[in-house]
Amino acid sequence: MSEELPQRRETHPEELVRNVRERERDTWQWTSIRVPEEILQRWLAMLRSGRNRKKVYREMQKWMWIHPKGPVIRACGCRLCNPGWGT
């Protein structure tokens, strides 16, 4: 008896990009309503320049790992509802 390895489904580049964007969006939605005000304002300012998206994403992931049950402290994490450094 020989077992076959499971076949991996081929993914197209467009699908990979979509999955990354969805993961980033979900991470932002989870962390932006839970992080302290200072951290959120710093992230918004970093995202404004555009070059720091990966760095902010890594910091969000680290924050999620450290605070897996972080309480919701604001209703929305968008730039319009939280003006500050990034405006």
Curated annotation (Swiss-Prot):
One of its GO terms (cellular component) is host cell nucleus. Its main location: virion. Keywords: Cell cycle, Host nucleus, Virion. Pfam families: Lentiviral_Tat. It comes from the Viruses. Coiled coil: none annotated. The keyword Cell cycle applies. The keyword Cell cycle applies. It is found in: Virion; Host nucleus. A motif (Nuclear export signal) lies at residues 40-47. A motif (Nuclear localization signal) lies at residues 48-55. Seems to function as a Vpr-like protein, since it mediates host cell cycle arrest in G2 phase. Cell cycle arrest creates a favorable environment for maximizing viral expression and production. This is Probable Vpr-like protein. It comes from Caprine arthritis encephalitis virus (strain Cork) (CAEV-Co). The gene is tat.
